[in-house]
């Protein structure tokens, strides 16, 4: 018996699946029916056996939507010492005027458009990435400072869920429930 919402029912195809034809070496790729052929001419049996939603994905095919990887920097030896260090760009030291202007812009809008970022970079004599990173850091700092979790409750390494008051209350509630249930089943 197949239940209306059972696994067998969900996974079963609502349409009868045609039996795939397997091409023999004598069969050329052009003679394969379009239902079973992929764009490169090879048999595509899977696409005929499963509904179309199986092959859909929530990820975009655009190259910019994929994972971002930082470019690795080459290490150079430092002469006689023989040790190698990674070159790092020095930290940007913003002038007071630049900081005032960045703070003013941040109060107006926490997010900049690309055009506004370009204009601001030109006006302040900075590059766009410096402005972008300043805004990212400022948003992160604001989020951290306005967090609802009190600072003294946070662990410096990892949070301990056993120290949370709602969990202790939950344990007490479950213990009380167990007592009530135990009394209900006593003869």
Swiss-Prot record:
<dbReference type="InterPro" id="IPR000047">
    <property type="entry name" value="HTH_motif"/>
</dbReference>
<dbReference type="InterPro" id="IPR001356">
    <property type="entry name" value="HD"/>
</dbReference>
<dbReference type="InterPro" id="IPR009057">
    <property type="entry name" value="Homeodomain-like_sf"/>
</dbReference>
<comment type="similarity">
    <text>Belongs to the engrailed homeobox family.</text>
</comment>
<keyword id="KW-0238">DNA-binding</keyword>
<feature type="compositionally biased region" description="Polar residues">
    <location>
        <begin position="145"/>
        <end position="163"/>
    </location>
</feature>
<dbReference type="GO" id="GO:0005634">
    <property type="term" value="C:nucleus"/>
</dbReference>
<dbReference type="GO" id="GO:0045944">
    <property type="term" value="P:positive regulation of transcription by RNA polymerase II"/>
</dbReference>
<dbReference type="GO" id="GO:0009957">
    <property type="term" value="P:epidermal cell fate specification"/>
</dbReference>
<dbReference type="GO" id="GO:0006357">
    <property type="term" value="P:regulation of transcription by RNA polymerase II"/>
</dbReference>
<protein>
    <recommendedName>
        <fullName>Homeobox protein engrailed-like ceh-16</fullName>
    </recommendedName>
</protein>
<dbReference type="GO" id="GO:0000978">
    <property type="term" value="F:RNA polymerase II cis-regulatory region sequence-specific DNA binding"/>
</dbReference>
<dbReference type="InterPro" id="IPR050720">
    <property type="entry name" value="Engrailed_Homeobox_TFs"/>
</dbReference>
<keyword id="KW-0963">Cytoplasm</keyword>
<feature type="region of interest" description="Disordered">
    <location>
        <begin position="14"/>
        <end position="43"/>
    </location>
</feature>
<feature type="compositionally biased region" description="Low complexity">
    <location>
        <begin position="20"/>
        <end position="39"/>
    </location>
</feature>
<comment type="function">
    <text>Transcriptional regulator which binds to DNA to regulate gene expression and promote seam cell development and differentiation during embryogenesis. Plays a role in maintaining the boundaries between the lateral rows of seam cells and the ventral and dorsal row of epidermal cells during embryonic development. Negatively regulates the expression of the fusion effector protein eff-1 to prevent seam cell fusion with the dorsal and ventral epidermal cells during embryonic elongation.</text>
</comment>
<feature type="DNA-binding region" description="Homeobox">
    <location>
        <begin position="87"/>
        <end position="146"/>
    </location>
</feature>
<dbReference type="GO" id="GO:0000122">
    <property type="term" value="P:negative regulation of transcription by RNA polymerase II"/>
</dbReference>
<keyword id="KW-0804">Transcription</keyword>
<feature type="region of interest" description="Disordered">
    <location>
        <begin position="144"/>
        <end position="167"/>
    </location>
</feature>
<keyword id="KW-0217">Developmental protein</keyword>
<dbReference type="InterPro" id="IPR020479">
    <property type="entry name" value="HD_metazoa"/>
</dbReference>
<dbReference type="GO" id="GO:0043565">
    <property type="term" value="F:sequence-specific DNA binding"/>
</dbReference>
<dbReference type="InterPro" id="IPR017970">
    <property type="entry name" value="Homeobox_CS"/>
</dbReference>
<keyword id="KW-0539">Nucleus</keyword>
<dbReference type="Pfam" id="PF00046">
    <property type="entry name" value="Homeodomain"/>
</dbReference>
<keyword id="KW-0805">Transcription regulation</keyword>
<dbReference type="GO" id="GO:0010172">
    <property type="term" value="P:embryonic body morphogenesis"/>
</dbReference>
<dbReference type="GO" id="GO:0005737">
    <property type="term" value="C:cytoplasm"/>
</dbReference>
<keyword id="KW-0371">Homeobox</keyword>
<dbReference type="GO" id="GO:0048859">
    <property type="term" value="P:formation of anatomical boundary"/>
</dbReference>
<feature type="region of interest" description="Disordered">
    <location>
        <begin position="60"/>
        <end position="100"/>
    </location>
</feature>
<dbReference type="GO" id="GO:0000981">
    <property type="term" value="F:DNA-binding transcription factor activity, RNA polymerase II-specific"/>
</dbReference>
């Amino acid at each position: 018996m197949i239940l209306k919402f059972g696994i067998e029912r969900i996974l079963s195809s609502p349409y009868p699946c045609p039996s795939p034809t397997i091409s023999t070496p004598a069969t050329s790729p052009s003679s394969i029916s379009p239902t079973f052929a992929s764009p490169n001419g090879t048999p595509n049996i899977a696409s005929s056996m499963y509904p179309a939603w199986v092959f859909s994905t929530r990820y975009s095919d655009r190259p910019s939507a994929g994972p971002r990887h930082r470019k690795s920097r080459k290490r150079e030896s430092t002469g006689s010492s023989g040790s190698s260090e990674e070159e790092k760009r020095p930290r940007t030291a913003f002038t007071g005027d630049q900081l005032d202007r960045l703070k003013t812009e941040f109060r107006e809008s926490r997010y900049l458009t690309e055009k506004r970022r370009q204009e601001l970079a030109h006006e302040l004599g900075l590059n766009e990435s410096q402005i972008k990173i300043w805004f990212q850091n400022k948003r992160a700092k604001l989020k951290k400072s306005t967090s609802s979790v009190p600072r003294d409750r946070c662990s410096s390494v990892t949070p301990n869920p056993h120290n949370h008051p709602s969990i202790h209350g939950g344990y007490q509630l479950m213990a009380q429930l167990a007592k009530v249930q135990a009394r209900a089943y006593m003869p």
